[in-house]
Amino acid sequence: MPTITLPDGSQRSFDHPVSVAEVAASIGAGLAKATVAGKVNGKLVDACDIIDSDATLQIITPKDEEGLEIIRHSCAHLVGHAVKQLYPTAKMVIGPVIDEGFYYDIAFERPFTPDDMAAIEQRMHQLIDTEYDVIKKVTPRAEVIEVFKARGEDYKLRLVEDMPNEQAMGLYYHEEYVDMCRGPHVPNTRFLKSFKLTKLSGAYWRGDAKNEQLQRVYGTAWADKKQLAAYIQRIEEAEKRDHRKIGKRLGLFHTQEEAPGMVFWHPNGWTLYQVLEQYMRKVQRDNGYLEIKTPQVVDRSLWEKSGHWANYADNMFTTESESRDYAIKPMNCPCHVQVFNQGLKSYRELPMRLAEFGACHRNEPSGALHGIMRVRAFTQDDAHIFCTEEQMQAESAAFIKLTMDVYRDFGFTDVEMKLSTRPEKRVGSDELWDRAEAALAAALDSAGLPYDLQPGEGAFYGPKIEFSLKDCLGRVWQCGTLQLDFNLPVRLGAEYVSEDNSRKHPVMLHRAILGSFERFVGILIEHYEGAFPAWLAPTQAVIMNITDKQADFVVQVEKTLNESGFRAKSDLRNEKIGFKIREHTLLKVPYLLVIGDKEVEMQTVAVRTREGADLGSMPVAQFAEFLAQAVSRRGRPDSE
């Protein structure tokens, strides 16, 4: 009979097989009521699952991350229950957990409307209020097929076909509604009270635009009402910061249907984009990178050699000319190897750091496109470092330091790092992987940076480090990457002459700091809500006159500031000064300079900030010095 070992090391013995729920009840009524599921010998199981031999057990409650994920998964099933009651002809497809929520894909004869979503949410609350038990039944495959045939659930039958080796499957019954899942799920709907449906969208069966279109219902769920309210507040704040709305309001960019996933940059937005590019160009030049430019359209033969044609063709835009097939490059790496291959290199020339602001195109599904955050045409701050195995650690350490410095300049100090190690299927010897993983780990350790280990999550051709920024709302954006590659230099014949005069393949480090410029601009817009630090602001100062008498001095100040390397504009419109100040404050211009008769007489400017602070009057040269200091701080706090 089982002896159960709990996380604190205490043990409980039973004279009969017991469920997770029964063990929880033996500990206390409060824990029994809070039990969502269990973790038996490290494996998540339902609260009703039986333990019949000695085991370790962790009781999972809504306070645990796994408990929250189970609540979200069960909410997806609850969507199915409500939809089938309201729209009996709907066919249920899949309902997975996603970051901070869940969705359910549904086949229905018409698109769902916001009114439908409200009705589904209301019915879900009604079902939750009955506090019914969710019943799990492990069911033989043949019976599962009969269950879904009887209900006309064609997509569920297709999913069963996808699992030919599964002879028994978990069916979860929400009263008359049944769904198929590996689980676990909550034992009762009382755990699901803190949820909200958030949006509707279209989707495709299996994510393929050639397949039938489905309706996708998104939602979020939390452990309690307080967490849900905090999330809703965060979402409302995020909507206020939506880069698409701010981009339009500030005249930064737009997108349109005739060029899906492509950006029309307006003067203000293009100015911001160029500031990023010029900054990164200087940073990379100062750190030993050589800037190059490679073709946009490349013959399919190179993509076949690199492996992209076989593995990435669906995401590539292709064309044909004079009986030859070409692809618009989705990435820069194969072209950078071609530059390295021009002339045999010596070990003395390594490391060689080749950088490109590489314009790439990827055929992303139209449903996945989102403003400038997810596009089809984008530019990367892409670079590839060709080095020896012995140089891997030093190059990695230098890149990590550079990356963290860049992020600080943009105002991001909370950076998460993940080290992904060897997957089961991989190229290269275990000894090479040992050295590569050790090099990346040592580089992170030498920088004194904490990181999460992701075993088995590396690419087949090498381990990698991912850098993710946390913005002012706590959202995490994966931007930077350092990817070691043992494969591509071999495939594309990259070699150097080593110290012993033999030829060797270099290790290739794929690296990016910002990632996509377009996406990074979107992140900056939302992080700063359009109120960029002075160094990034498209217009750093606007000079305004009170009456026509000051116009000449306004123009003179504008010329002085622009000749000093700043981005200044004048506003000579025949409008009240209060109107001008309000307008440029809404346009998020950092500094507003007002010139009246007194300022003309004293040859000064009255300086206000967009936040409303009055900095007083000062000579133009003094303001230029003040602005230069603000620009030099970049996005770092004043104390740095």
Curated annotation (Swiss-Prot):
Residues noted as binding Zn(2+) in the record, renumbered to the chain: 333, 384, 510
Keywords from UniProt, A to Z, are: Aminoacyl-tRNA synthetase, ATP-binding, Cytoplasm, Ligase, Metal-binding, Nucleotide-binding, Protein biosynthesis, RNA-binding, tRNA-binding, Zinc
Transferase: present as a keyword of the record? no
Which Pfam family, an example, fits this chain?
tRNA-synt_2b
GO biological process per UniProt:
threonyl-tRNA aminoacylation
Quote the cellular component terms of the Gene Ontology held in the record.
Answer: cytosol
Predominant location: cytoplasm
- TGS domain location is 1-61
NCBIfam families named in the record: thrS
Q: Which family does it belong to?
A: Belongs to the class-II aminoacyl-tRNA synthetase family.
State what protein this is by name.
Threonine--tRNA ligase
What organism does the record attribute this protein to? Pseudomonas fluorescens (strain Pf0-1)
- Give the encoding gene's name: thrS
